[in-house]
Curated annotation (Swiss-Prot):
PROSITE patterns: PYROKININ
Coiled coil start-end: none
Annotated GO MF terms: neuropeptide hormone activity
InterPro entries xref list: PBAN (IPR008730), Pyrokinin_CS (IPR001484)
Entry keyword annotation includes Phosphoprotein: no
Main location: secreted
Signal peptide (from-to): 1-23
Compartment annotation: Secreted
Protein name, as recorded: PBAN-type neuropeptides
Note: Juvenile hormone seems to allow PBAN release, which then induces pheromone biosynthesis.
Amino acid sequence: MFNQTQLFVFLAVFTTSSVLGNNNDVKDGAASGAHSDRLGLWFGPRLGKRSLRISTEDNRQAFFKLLEAADALKYYYDQLPYEMQADEPETRVTKKVIFTPKLGRSLAYDDKSFENVEFTPRLGRRLSDDMPATPADQEMYRQDPEQIDSRTKYFSPRLGRTMNFSPRLGRELSYDMMPNKIRVVRSTNKTRST
């Protein structure tokens, strides 16, 4: 904050001194404007032209006015809430690197030790005979012999289903109670028989 004020005061003083100390005299031998073939003719100052030279006393007064304005600016800037004040710029540039490892990669590439992980089968799938399993797993996934059906080897029901079911309704009915000959007739004109 103080550095910003010093910079503002320095720029104000530099601008004032460059404006006040500006020399409007034409240098000897220098061509000016589009008419450079004046051949040593000297034209006097234009009538009514004001000089920008101010006496040294006026320079001091202007300098003090600039300092007073800079002080007032700093005072009102300090009165602003902290959220509205500009943060001081950082002098050094820091580059933050956030390291996110890729999935499946380890941080230590030299240490390639793999942990023994027990295999958990999917729901509804049976363990094959060649796949080793711990005794606890064998007991957990063993089913009752009554629930095991020969169809499960060829057809797997929904996940987690182990009960017997009939694929179509009416297939388990005994046909002894029904007559031997059933006549089924369909009408072509969509009429119903009563």
